[in-house]
């Protein structure tokens, strides 16, 4: 009898542990080629000490402060854009096209905190936001407030269409920055936004048990599957800041839908297969030919993290060769002691050549040449440093090697923590190692932390 009770106890503990792992921010508990899996998002509580204090500041101050900013139309249209797209009020889209994704990141942060403290006010706040997101989403699953608002203002009620995927891609002038149609301009950041919607929907379901936002994420992922099955090679280049690589793989883990895993593999296959790719966007050459870190550091690190997710599910050794080589290039030649990366404000690709002027490519907020690591003019965007942490977190899970945990810790204590003030209300976009008042030129971003940054991607990421 005692043996039976012991076996039941062990079985119960095993099931409990598996459930906790499957409720993590990422769920690699069933990933065939991962050696580790993290705990559930509500399974660990900071009770005291340095990180206990940071958690309290973030949960009590930062989340509400960000919401107040996004809910103040005179400062930011972050939430107002969703209200307009949902038909709650009328108006024009205002602000950068990636604000949707930034709000989804904030939503993911709120859900993560709610998983720990079960604050009912946070639950109401999330429900309020989710209601607008669901109303703003098109019937085919597409959601991008600049496009949806434009459609509404032209008298097109895309919310009312019943049949999935019967809407056509509006944009036809690929690369025209004045074109606002769906996927017309790769700099509209649609896939970036959709990727963060996926992650927010997953984390919200794991934290609350509700499926409202998750259902919207499923519809968006299905739309993306259809898009990449039918889109031209040119349109398929839409992968600016590819958070959707991570998002699609996590959706596969959350649903078991094999279409999502196939999509994640396809995203890597088509990368670099079109003309006029850029080092800045890591698509001048196919990913499997890349062995050095290049270009825009946020885009790069998001890409590397997403590819690590794909490796965890497929075990493709070529991808691990690329990731290992790129990681070594970053850590030994292109990273600061703080874990910060992306040293250049603006520059030219190291792979360009003055002997072939047509091949010289501009880069921005990017990795530079080996050891090109200035102190006073370092860009080191907070999102790039967080991306470095996301990349190393996934490499830790798939390899079990502690060197990746060391890098996560280095970033967290230094180049990520520097992005937010002690009171949790002000933020840095850039994180130079030295700030000087005597520079003979003016840098683009302020030298002091501010409550609102026009590129508000870093605060919710932090």
Give the role of each language-model region:
Residues 1-23:
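Bacterial Sec-dependent N-terminal signal peptides
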Residues 21-462:
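Glycan-recognition and catalytic cores of secretory/periplasmic carbohydrate-active enzymes
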